[in-house]
């Protein structure tokens, strides 16, 4: 039996500036840390990516043709302020005005993110968000955008504070490539939520047009053996690292007793001390009820088991199934439940985890107001044939997740839209161009777009509101 989604539900597609735009060195754009990091550590760069900088009229026309009425776009901070602050780059400002005008022309609502993993190099090399000065630079950049781009109706401050700290200071797959540093991880999370709160407080105080929220990656954590208290504790601690610390700060304006006990335990075992100031919490408390929405990025869940050894994390960047490892001293280890499917990159496919995560937000953070699923999708080594991709596995993945969203709405959650990652194939931070997510196949040499089977299926769902 099919399941319904609301008539006003947004069926969107998601992009990000650095992963889609290309044009990383033209029209006055300043460098970001990724430019050098990719050149030095990987076999690919973000040039030309999907050339969205030039191809956006094509992509937005496809949105209109395929029933996609929302798009996630991020502004490249260094395209507006090449050094992160100071002089404004007029060509960057002009580009985003043209982009938003094209969105309006095609009747596609832009949900605009201010920071999607791409701090300008000048600020990044000066400590990124570990340096409190950069919090103020971010707020000033946000203020400029709120005032300049008044045509935008939906703003998000940050995309995925969790994976930023995780990538930069735990796994080391993001610049500056530091591993296993929990002090930096939690401090980065705290300072970024503080920057978010300051931007939200400014937005509301100045009465800017539109709505504002934050996008969080929320992978659901389960105990491998629910009857083993040590497995239960491992899941709780991993949830604090990736989810609860950030959600508490955003929606409670403080860290709950349980959260701080977990953080202090992790820091005691692994070393480190946090700088949490009284004035930080004044700012966080002032903002906690002002978020207009929460964006949830959900791809997978994890099962956690007890673990006594040293920390070792191996990131599977090549699609060699089973090659990843995640075990943290004093926390636990990820242990795959063999009965649950996973991708070649060891991402566990578990739609129920999205339902459980939405339910958790509804229960623990009742001031959330509304939710958008701002990313969800299946990365695949797509086979291009007959000028398309027969991506039935992707269709199945999206269908299952839309079904549990329908269930969550029926059970009282206020979920207003879904943005598939990704609109078209884009550059992937730690996988380059092999791992594809898009509704539209991109030939990265010619930049031609081809609708996949999933694009036609998604069009039908957006028209009928049925899955």
Swiss-Prot record:
Activity regulation comment: Inhibited by both galactose-6-phosphate and ATP.
Superkingdom in the source lineage: Bacteria
pH dependence: Optimum pH is 7.0-7.5.
Pathway: Carbohydrate metabolism; lactose degradation; D-galactose 6-phosphate and beta-D-glucose from lactose 6-phosphate: step 1/1
EC number: 3.2.1.85
Description of what induces expression: Induced during growth on lactose or lactulose.
MF GO annotations: 6-phospho-beta-galactosidase activity; beta-glucosidase activity; galactosidase activity
Active site, UniProt feature: 160, 375
Lineage: Bacteria, Fusobacteriati, Fusobacteriota, Fusobacteriia, Fusobacteriales
Record's catalysed reaction(s): a 6-phospho-beta-D-galactoside + H2O = D-galactose 6-phosphate + an alcohol
Family named by the database record: Belongs to the glycosyl hydrolase 1 family.
Organism of this sequence: Leptotrichia buccalis (strain ATCC 14201 / DSM 1135 / JCM 12969 / NCTC 10249 / C-1013-b)
Binding-site list for D-galactose 6-phosphate: 19, 116, 159-160, 297, 428-429, 435, 437
NCBIfam families: lacG, PRK13511.1
Matching PANTHER family: GLYCOSYL HYDROLASE (PTHR10353), LP05116P (PTHR10353:SF36)
Designated name of the protein: 6-phospho-beta-galactosidase
UniProt record, GO biological process: lactose catabolic process; lactose catabolic process via tagatose-6-phosphate
InterPro entries reported in the protein's UniProt record: 6P-beta-galactosidase, Glyco_hydro_1, Glyco_hydro_1_AS, Glyco_hydro_1_N_CS, Glycoside_hydrolase_SF
Keyword annotations from UniProtKB, A to Z: Glycosidase, Hydrolase
Stored HAMAP family: LacG
Assigned GO CC terms: cytosol
């Amino acid at each position: 039996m099919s399941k319904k989604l609301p008539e006003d539900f947004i069926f969107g597609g998601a992009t990000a500036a650095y992963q889609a735009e290309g044009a990383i060195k033209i029209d006055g754009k300043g460098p970001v840390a990724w430019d050098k990091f990719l050149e030095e550590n990987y076999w690919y760069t973000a040039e030309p990516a999907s050339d969205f900088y030039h191809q956006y009229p094509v992509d937005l026309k496809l949105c209109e043709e395929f029933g996609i009425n929302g798009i996630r776009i991020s502004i490249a901070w260094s395209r507006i302020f090449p050094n992160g602050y100071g002089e404004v780059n007029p060509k960057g400002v002009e580009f985003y005005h043209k982009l938003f005008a094209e969105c309006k022309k095609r009747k596609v609502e832009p949900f605009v993110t201010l920071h999607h993993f791409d701090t300008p190099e000048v600020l990044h090399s000066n400590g990124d968000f570990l340096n409190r000065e950069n919090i103020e630079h971010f707020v000033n950049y946000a203020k400029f955008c709120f005032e300049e781009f008044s045509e935008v109706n939906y703003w998000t401050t940050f995309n995925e504070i969790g994976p930023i700290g995780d990538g930069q200071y735990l796994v080391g797959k993001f610049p500056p490539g530091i591993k296993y540093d929990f002090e930096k991880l939690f401090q980065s999370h705290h300072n970024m939520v503080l920057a978010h709160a300051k931007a939200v407080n400014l937005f509301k105080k100045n009465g800017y047009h539109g709505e504002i929220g934050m996008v969080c990656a929320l992978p659901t954590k389960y105990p491998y053996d629910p009857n083993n208290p040590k497995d239960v504790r491992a899941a709780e601690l991993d949830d604090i690292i990736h989810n609860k610390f950030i959600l508490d700060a955003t929606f409670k304006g403080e860290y709950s007793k349980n959260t701080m006990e977990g953080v202090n335990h992790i820091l005691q075992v692994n070393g480190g001390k946090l700088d949490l100031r009284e004035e930080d919490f004044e700012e966080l408390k002032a903002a906690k009820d002002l978020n207009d929405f929460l964006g949830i990025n959900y791809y997978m869940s994890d099962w956690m088991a007890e673990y006594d050894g040293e920390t070792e994390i191996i990131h599977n960047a090549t699609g060699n199934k089973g090659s990843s490892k995640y075990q943290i001293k004093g926390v636990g280890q990820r242990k795959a439940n063999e009965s649950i499917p996973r991708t070649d990159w060891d991402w566990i496919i578990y739609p129920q985890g999205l339902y459980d995560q939405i339910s958790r937000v509804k229960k623990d953070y009742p001031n959330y107001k509304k939710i958008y699923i701002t990313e969800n999708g299946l990365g695949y080594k797509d086979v291009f044939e007959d000028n398309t991709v027969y991506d039935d596995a992707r269709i199945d993945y999206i269908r299952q997740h839309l079904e549990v969203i329908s269930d969550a709405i029926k059970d009282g959650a206020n979920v207003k839209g879904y943005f598939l990652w990704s609109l078209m194939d884009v550059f992937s931070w730690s996988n380059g161009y092999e791992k594809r997510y898009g509704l539209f196949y991109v030939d990265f040499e010619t930049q031609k777009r081809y609708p996949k089977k999933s694009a036609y299926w998604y069009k039908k769902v957006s028209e009928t509101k049925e899955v």
